[in-house]
């Protein structure tokens, strides 16, 4: 019986890894595809904020409601439906003739992504440790690394951003089929090992209203808003910065943009090995200091290769931050509020993904692309300050 349970857990972990690879792929596509998309639809540079906002609307809605959805449908059913929804949205991007229809499909893709993200994060935070959380998010990094590469190949060979989205859409549909075939495994309950077994985060039934009244919950959500906003901003705007003002060719810029996600992935793999030994606070604080230095180097740009060095440094530095913050949710807000807070944090990531890159796009349009690294430095420095505030609050609690 124990062997069967162990095999089931291993299978679910592998599927979770694959799901996060697929989840990361679309996030890596947009930054490289955007110059071609805006020319195709004759729209301004900062119109990307509209698409991001639409995606976030869907993402925030499904992530906030992920708890009730999983309780009613089961984890496997939610994941299967969500992957199919994401695949449909991405495929739709390639078929619509006008911009506003692509924006509407952004909501569809966001609905799918939000439920996958929140559901898997809650499941892993409840059942596994910090090391596995880092490895899970490393698989997301693999997906985001593959995204720019797939899109660069599509643009270089057939000059078609639509091909890149169709390839990634196919991955989403295949994954949806995998979840359908393993529904029984996801929905199976573990047998209780005794009345003194520690409660999992999902065992607490704290009302959402009570959770929302906790100031520390909102402070925790702010961390995710700032972090994911900065992470997605660099992924979204690196390519445009390199080809716009740094004189880098599109093919090389695509590879450099991919280097951000590559070092990002390597960083999470390394963190997965050392996470337990180093501890959450050191991972987060060290990563944020490295990110501030990397963003400053990107802005300084003393020689051409420094852009590549800066992007790679930021990717490696911020790699462990998101999973470490996710694993530390219970420590920051208390176990009673952790499950609800995770859903709120995932909603905050969606909001940050739309607001911060969109604002940076507005600033870049009104001034210069060179304002991008300045904005990143400010956001990372603010995030470091907010995190230190939460650490001090924990110490006083």
PLM features: residue spans?
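Interfacial helix-cap and linker-helix signal at transmembrane-aqueous boundaries
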Residues: 37-38, 69-70, 150-159, 242-243, ...
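Extracytoplasmic gate region of multi-pass secondary transporters
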Residues: 30-31, 214-258, 262-265
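A late C-terminal transmembrane helix in Major Facilitator Superfamily
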Residues: 334-369, 376
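Cytoplasmic helix-loop-helix junction between adjacent transmembrane helices
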Residues: 105-140
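Helix-loop-helix hairpin linking two adjacent transmembrane segments in secondary transporters
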Residues: 136-188
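Helix-to-loop junctions at the C-terminal end of transmembrane segments
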Residues: 62-75, 267-279, 364-365
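Conserved MFS/SLC helix-loop-helix module at the cytosolic interface between two early adjacent transmembrane helices
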Residues: 61-100
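Helix-breaking motifs and short loop linkers at transmembrane-helix boundaries and internal kinks
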Residues: 42, 74, 95-100, 247, ...
